């Protein structure tokens, strides 16, 4: 019988329940989500284009005359409808995902001035993608539930036995193309994010999985 591969490694700080966790687990979760939010903020400040899901929100807003915030909310709701057949459940991490990322995204864009030189903007964008990927990988290893879109990624990986890299990249590129066709604005940063974030998340998951104290199934 073929050995099952874990999509997300079971770490020493992983929660045993979606709604209860030790102080260490919560601390790591909050740290990871804050890093993710800062990374998102740096991408926004770079001015090189929004993330693919934001491009889709823009496109839907243009086609429906909805506010972009409402479009984003409706997308999240639509994505979570797919959770049930993928056997995904809400957890504490799902709720904190929404709150903490938005908080640190706002803080980052308020305290840092957007760069003007193209080189500096590229640096902001690249560092933002790395932080976004690291934060995503780290918070998922807490096993307290994923955000709506990350949950979709994990669910597809588990259902079809695919890697995070393949699924995340496919989702981001597909969403980017759909958003563009609907009228959303695609920039260099959007393309960089869509084509690299899957590899970045997979890279950090592989590093975490190979820490000596973490049992990991290959």
Swiss-Prot record:
Disulfide bonds: none annotated. The keyword Membrane applies. InterPro entries: YczE/YyaS-like. It is found in: Cell membrane. Keywords: Cell membrane, Membrane, Transmembrane, Transmembrane helix. It is a multi-pass membrane protein. It comes from the Bacteria. The chain crosses the membrane at residues 28-48, 66-86, 92-112, 122-142, 173-193. GO terms for cellular component: plasma membrane. This is Uncharacterized protein HI_0522. It comes from Haemophilus influenzae (strain ATCC 51907 / DSM 11121 / KW20 / Rd).
